[in-house]
């Protein structure tokens, strides 16, 4: 058997989370059209059955925030998540957006090398190659170079996955692959469409080929290491991203304050009651009670999140509840509150509280305190 960790790296909106969900077959990462949707490392586990000339394998995929030059403390924390994901890995997938690369190529052809070099002066970074040297490298730009500098330091196989091939013409693909191959000695280059699931089988086969021999890291039935509380908070944030615009989605964060699971159901399930006209009455599912806080930075953002007569908050809650019910397999009572936390994106302490790993540590510490108090009373 083979097993190992595969980190998925790329610029914002390359389709990393869509690829992760498609590979795992479960929604473990939220997906929107807005950049910087992913803020944490997201783990997805894929069980690969053995087949002719291929052993069974467990691939632990790690989705990462979009690689970008950090501005706020939140940005820096997101980039730290990227660095951490690159430390514990056996293979790295560098994912690029084929449609974006082709647009860059067309823009460069229209502008010409001189105009392009002039336009990129503001993008130069300390220690980067001269602007004239990097102004035109096939389809490569300084933002891509920033991503590539991360993988140049790695000592593991790096795959180039060219995503969104369904958005470009077939005759454009080979020249694009040739252009991108000039940038780095990638171990493998694979065109894929995460949205349409094209090329994923070939990608998985190649990953298994490169993975080391080893045992499973997770039980076969487990598809992520994220707790349900975090998944629920992310689903709420996904709806905020989709329901609001401008700066509001980026200034919003969700924290689950209460997560009350229904009592354990009896082993013998209740059978549906037959109806007179045929069919069966719907069996009511148990209810999970959830209370969540949405944090934003300004009163104006809070007003937008609430909307006229509370309409926006209701829409966020209704759509999020449906997603959460699908995740949990229960009915859900969802209560949302909004709190203004000025400048939270620059507060390291506050950002720590949003990390689900830190939340689990705090919960464990509180439970230990309660147990200690009870033992002391006895």
Give residue ranges: language-model regions.
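P-loop NTP-binding site
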Residues: 228-378
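Conserved G1/Walker A P-loop phosphate-binding module
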Residues: 1-87, 96
């Amino acid at each position: 058997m083979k097993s190992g960790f595969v980190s998925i790296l790329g610029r914002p909106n390359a389709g990393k989370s869509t690829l992760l969900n498609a590979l795992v077959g479960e929604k473990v990462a939220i997906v929107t059209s807005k950049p910087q949707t992913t803020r944490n490392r997201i783990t997805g586990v894929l069980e690969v059955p053995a087949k002719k000339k291929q052993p069974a394998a467990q691939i632990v995929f790690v989705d990462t925030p979009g690689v970008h030059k950090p501005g706020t403390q939140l940005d820096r924390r997101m980039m730290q998540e990227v660095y951490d994901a690159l430390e514990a890995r056996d293979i790295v997938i560098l994912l690029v957006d084929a449609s974006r690369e082709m647009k860059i190529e067309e823009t460069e052809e229209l502008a010409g090398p001189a105009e392009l070099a002039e336009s990129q002066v503001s993008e130069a970074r300390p220690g980067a190659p001269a602007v004239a040297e990097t102004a035109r490298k096939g389809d490569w730009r300084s933002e891509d170079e920033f991503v590539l500098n991360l993988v140049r330091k790695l000592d593991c196989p790096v795959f180039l996955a060219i995503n969104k091939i369904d958005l470009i013409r077939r005759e454009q693909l080979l020249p694009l692959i040739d252009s991108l191959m000039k940038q780095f000695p990638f171990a493998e280059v694979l065109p894929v469409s995460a949205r349409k699931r094209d090329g994923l089988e070939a990608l998985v086969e190649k990953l298994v080929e490169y993975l080391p021999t080893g045992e499973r890291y997770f039980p076969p039935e487990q598809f992520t290491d994220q707790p349900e509380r975090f998944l629920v908070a992310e689903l709420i944030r996904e709806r905020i991203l989709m329901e609001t615009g401008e700066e509001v989605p980026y200034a919003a964060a969700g924290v689950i304050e209460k997560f009350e699971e229904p009592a354990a159901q009896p082993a013998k399930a209740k059978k549906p009651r037959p109806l007179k006209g045929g069919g069966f009455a719907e069996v009511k599912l148990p209810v999970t009670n959830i209370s969540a806080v949405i944090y934003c930075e300004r009163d104006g953002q809070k007003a937008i999140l609430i909307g006229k007569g509370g309409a926006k908050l209701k829409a966020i809650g209704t759509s999020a509840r449906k997603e959460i019910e699908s995740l949990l397999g229960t009915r859900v009572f969802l209560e949302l509150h909004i709190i203004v936390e000025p400048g939270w994106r620059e507060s390291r302490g506050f950002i720590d509280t949003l990390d689900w790993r830190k939340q689990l540590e705090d919960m464990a510490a509180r439970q230990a305190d309660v147990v200690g108090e009870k033992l002391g009373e006895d």
